[in-house]
UniProtKB/Swiss-Prot annotation:
This is Zygotic DNA replication licensing factor mcm6-B. It is found in: Nucleus. The gene is zmcm6-b. It comes from the Eukaryota. The lineage of its organism: Eukaryota, Metazoa, Chordata, Craniata, Vertebrata. ATP binds at residues 397-404.
Length: 825
């Protein structure tokens, strides 16, 4: 088929002699031969079916593998790579001819070619002028997307003087009119009108990409470059995506510089020379002016694909991913390793040590962050309400307790993570900003940290230092996982399906064990309820721990590689994470009942004043338990949430809900309203450490002898011992209440004291110790009655205010257990 370029016929009619590009025409012929002759591994013509697809109205781009091209003709591949921008129109003509041979293609339809699988990838920093015009592959993170516009690629103009049509005037990234009317009699050079019906337009979109943190040299500012997408490539990436762009680097006039406010963007008047030489010099900029001759580099992309889709690109959260599709993406050796990991009995611990090999201790935090990476299962109700599956974690702790290290580790490991500091971030920087485009002067949305971390993790350090108005901005993102913007005429709801890992310092710099969690952190109740897990790190002076940490740090400084003890490599963990995340575990009936039972326990404990939680228990904590259980099931590659998964989820949740550190109990506070409220921090866990700075030995409960000299020291009991005595008394009173004899169902205070002293008589060695023990148990019962309201004194006779009131205040009242009190395990 004899193809004649329409622009050539137009130029011939205008009497202009065009020089033939023989190299490009030869490339066109060879490329068409490649399309018609290249066969795949199955022996079929590889690109024939793709060409037949181009008949569909929405398709106009043929995707070609560069590896196939190199295999077919190395010289052709090299020429295309080096002279891509020059030969690109000719390659498109070859595609058009190839498509016409294999289908009924409309005459005026434009076709394009796109290349994939380019062998080398360049950084944005490496885009310099020597690379202009060659075929490149660059990678970066999309930070801003513009709306899709129609772009004029080939214009048909009407001469306003003689009504002649000038067809196929090629547009070079700016509005270009014909240089002269093609009618030999007419000398019109300026008065033309565009005929939009006969001109050709193509979809056009501009995006801005930026260097990723991993590619950035230390201390450098991230470079960014504008990318132009056309035809099928438009809308193929969203803000926050990490993508590879294949295309060429080109130079375009910088319109924003040329049309600076207050300066006319017209050709500046020149001092005329001899007649006929006034326009000599710069040509083709008539519409823009030559004031500054400002140009800029942009990247013209013909193909966009997610960076590393196997482990961490857009496919990480794809709904249609199955175990089979992931298995097909792995090599046999990789798949065997994933299978071996799934059979590991000690997988939970091994994954934690592999993820954070340089952080000593803090095992609970490691487990919580690991479950956050696996995540729960997102769901949608019948009404269309979305329930998030992502887990939010907050780490609160003293300075130098490795909070920021956890965040940095997650940022480096997670395929799509953004690290930001709370104090240096504004509401717009975290969510999304509306900015004015410098060229079109339209408002466009620029992605913030939460949008950039969509389908990933957003690490926010110094979370407590954020201004309140900035904290409020992420309320919606943390629960609904969307960001709503209504400003500058732009109304949009954007996705922010991200897990938030926050680190915060306590108020005053040190965690005060005598206060609840809420009093220790500068966070509002709505924000606190949106976190699934809270972890408290306290910098304790412990000789064993201090030695171990110092040893680990010195090892890291002296022998960096040898001291890192990993069971699995990071790549193996990433592969396993990707495989495990495609499981959608269902909750079994047994697990469902267990979850409900545990939630009831949390609510009842929160309701009773005795064991107040660190913050209010709401339905969000129930959802947190479900998400954590699903994360545990995913980690073990299970299709069903089992009670053991719920048990671990409840244990982690319990750790964060109840105050971890509890102060000593002051038994001498008689009718004083002290700030200290130990009942807020009661923890039934066996993990609670013995009280610190106490005057009572926490192991056997012996009281130290106190001097009678003023001022008299207050009698203090460590919290674990206080709790043990309290539980003993409650169990004894409940036992008496449950007896069905006709005896009394309550016990007098003196009888209870005698029973307790008899129980511990083996521990009492002297009369003095017996007196001390009796004093302690008397004070404990007084506190259980008047402060904790665990025990109730029964009034035998008369009502309050009657003549028998004095009898009610007897020294030896009957005691019963408060019916609302829940005895913890």
């Amino acid at each position: 088929m004899d193809l004649v370029d329409p622009s050539q016929s137009a130029a011939a009619a205008a009497g202009t002699q065009l020089v033939k590009d023989e190299v490009a025409e030869k490339c066109q012929k060879l490329f068409q031969d490649f399309l018609e002759e290249f066969r795949g591994s199955d022996g079929e013509l590889k690109y024939q079916s793709d060409a037949e697809e181009l008949i569909r109205p929405e398709r106009n781009t043929l995707l070609v593998s560069f590896v196939d091209l190199e295999q077919f003709n190395q010289q052709l591949a090299t020429t295309i790579q080096e002279e891509f921008y020059r030969v690109y129109p000719y390659l498109c003509r070859a595609v058009k001819a190839f498509a016409r041979d294999h289908g009924n293609i409309p005459q005026n339809k434009e076709f394009y070619v796109a290349f994939q699988e380019l062998p080398t990838r360049h950084k944005i920093r490496e885009l310099t002028t020597p690379r202009i015009g060659s075929l490149l592959r660059i990678s970066g993170q999309v930070v801003r997307t513009h709306p899709v516009h129609p772009e004029l690629v080939s214009g048909t103009f009407l001469c306003l003087d003689c009504q002649t049509l000038v067809r196929d005037v090629e547009q070079q990234f700016k509005y270009t009119q014909p240089s002269i009317c093609r009618n030999p009699v007419c000398a019109n050079r300026k008065r033309f009108m565009l005929d939009t019906n006969k001109s050709r337009f193509v979809d056009f979109q501009k995006v801005r990409i930026q260097e990723t943190q991993a590619e950035l040299p230390r201390g450098s500012i991230p470079r960014s470059v504008e990318v132009i997408l056309r035809a099928e490539a438009v809308e193929s990436c969203q803000a926050g995506d990490r993508c590879d762009f294949t295309g060429s680097l080109i130079v375009v006039p910088d319109i924003s510089q040329l049309s600076t406010p207050g300066v006319r963007a017209e050709t500046s008047s020149r001092v005329g020379g001899r007649e006929g030489y006034e326009a000599e010099g710069v040509q083709g900029l008539r519409a823009l002016g030559v004031r500054d001759l400002s140009y800029k580099l942009v990247f013209l992309a013909c193909y966009v694909c997610p960076t590393n889709p196997r482990f961490g690109g857009k496919d990480l959260h794809e709904e249609d991913m199955t175990a089979e599709s992931i298995k097909n993406q792995m090599s046999v050796k990789e798949w065997e390793k994933v299978f071996e990991m799934s059979q590991d009995k000690n997988l939970y611990h091994n994954l934690c040590t592999s993820l954070f090999p340089t952080v000593h201790g803090n095992d609970e935090v490691k487990r919580g962050i690991l479950l956050m990476l696996f995540g729960g299962v997102p769901k949608s109700t019948m009404e269309g309400t979305s329930l998030r599956g992502d887990i939010n974690v907050c780490v609160v702790g003293d300075p130098s307790t490795a909070k920021s290290q956890f965040l940095k580790h997650v940022e480096e490991f997670s395929p799509r993570a953004v690290y930001t500091s709370g104090k240096a971030s504004t509401a717009a920087g975290l969510t999304a900003a509306v900015v004015r485009d410098e060229e079109s002067h339209e408002f466009v949305i620029e992605a913030g940290a939460l949008m950039l971390a969509d389908n990933g993790v957003c690490c926010i350090d110094e979370f407590d230092k954020m201004d309140t108005k900035d904290q409020v901005a992420i309320h919606e993102a943390m629960e609904q996982q969307t960001i709503s913007i209504t400003k500058a005429g732009v109304k949009a709801t954007l996705n922010a399906r991200t897990s938030i890992l926050a680190a915060a310092n306590p108020v005053g710099g040190r965690y005060d064990r005598a206060k609840s969690l809420k009093q220790n952190v500068n966070l509002s109740a709505p924000i606190m309820s949106r976190f699934d897990l809270f972890f408290i790190l306290v910098d304790e002076c412990n000789e064993v721990t201090d030695y171990a940490i110092a040893r680990r740090i010195v090892d890291l400084h002296s022998r960096i590689e040898e001291s890192i003890d990993r069971v699995y490599t990071l790549d193996e963990v990433r592969r396993y994470l990707l495989f495990a995340r495609q499981f959608k575990p269902k909750i079994s009936k047994e697990s469902e009942d267990f979850i409900v039972e545990q939630y009831k326990r949390l609510r009842q404990r929160d309701g009773s004043g005795v064991t107040k939680s660190a913050w209010r228990i709401t339905v969000r904590q129930l959802e947190s338990m479900i998400r954590l259980s699903e994360g545990m099931a995913r980690m073990h590659c299970s299709d069903e949430v089992q009670p053991k998964h719920v048990k671990e989820a409840f244990r982690l949740l319990n750790k964060s809900i109840i105050r971890v550190e509890t102060p000593d109990v002051n038994l001498d506070q008689e009718d004083e309203h002290e700030v200290e409220e130990p009942q807020e921090g009661i923890n039934g866990d066996a993990d609670v450490p013995n009280g610190v700075n106490g005057h009572i030995n926490g192991i056997n409960g012996h009281a130290e002898e106190t001097n009678a000299a003023p001022p008299k020291p207050s009698l203090r009991l460590n919290f674990a011992e206080y709790k043990r005595i309290s539980n003993l008394l409650v169990l004894q009173l409940r036992k008496i209440e449950d007896e069905d004899d006709e005896n009394e169902t309550s016990q007098r205070k003196s009888e209870l004291i005698n029973w307790y002293l008899k129980e511990i008589e083996s521990e009492i060695d002297s009369e003095e110790e017996l007196v001390n023990r009796k004093q302690i148990i008397d004070k404990v019962i007084h506190r259980l009655v008047h402060y904790d309201q665990i025990l109730i004194e029964l009034i035998q006779t008369g009502l309050k205010g009657t003549e028998d009131e004095n009898v009610a205040k007897e020294e030896d009242p009957y005691l019963v257990v408060n019916p609302n009190y829940i005895l913890e395990d």
